[in-house]
A protein has these predicted regions:
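Helix-turn-helix
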Residues: 29, 37-71
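Generic hydrophobic, amphipathic alpha-helix propensity
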Residues: 23-34, 51, 76-84
Length: 215
């Protein structure tokens, strides 16, 4: 996998890099406030002044780290991705199954975040705003596929290849469409589409993909 394609992080997206823990905590408060607002009212209602008020900060503090709402949302999308990858890796920590079954944990975590993670449904990983929201050189699903490849490689002890990233991106594109449909009409998600997503991921990894031969 191309080592130069790094996964976007909150720290890399803020205007002023947090040096002290207090600054990092303030950024978390701003992102928490933004997530709470879009969870209730959607992305279009988000304003700098509302984020400042809800977080107990001044507008100047918001601008210190985020020059505009777009940059704040980009950082929130990156944090969603960080939370997602952390949770998937934790779910796989004691898993003894072959790595080709690991996408069950990835799908289950995505579903749980859709249902329970504040603000995730409104923003996801930023693709609801722009298909290249996290990185202008990659599609959002491309960034997502690289994150999954990194998790699998670290957990199961192999170096992700470009072929693996491509195959995972194909799966992500398919799964993304099914997940959008699952939550389009059902707030809790239509289990038929969710189960079909699991089934397709397992089948693709087992039968179709040119992937590393590891256990």
């Amino acid at each position: 996998m191309n080592d130069q394609q790094e996964i976007p992080t909150v720290q890399g997206l803020v205007r002023t890099e947090p040096i002290q823990q207090r600054s990092a905590q303030r950024i978390e408060m701003l992102l928490d406030a933004a997530a709470e607002i879009i969870h209730v009212s959607g992305i279009d209602s988000l304003t700098t002044s509302d984020v400042a008020t809800r977080s107990g900060s001044s507008v100047g503090v918001v601008y210190r780290y985020f020059p505009n709402i777009q940059s704040l949302l980009r950082a929130l999308a990156a944090r969603n991705l960080e939370h997602y990858t952390d949770r998937v890796f934790a779910a796989l920590e004691n898993d003894q199954h072959a790595w080709r079954n690991a996408l069950d944990a990835a799908i289950d975590t995505f579903v749980d975040m859709y249902r329970n993670h504040v603000g995730f449904r409104a923003l996801r990983f930023g693709d609801v705003i722009n298909d290249r929201f996290l990185d202008p050189t990659l599609s959002n699903n491309g960034v997502f596929a690289r994150a999954i490849a990194g998790i699998l490689g670290e957990k199961y002890g192999f170096a992700p290849t470009d072929d693996l990233v491509f195959e995972l991106e194909v799966i992500v594109e398919i799964e993304d469409a099914l997940m959008k449909r699952a939550f389009l009409l059902e707030p809790h998600g239509d289990e038929r589409f969710i189960e079909k997503a699991r089934e397709i991921a397992r089948s693709y990894l087992r039968d179709s993909a040119n992937l590393p031969d590891v256990s």
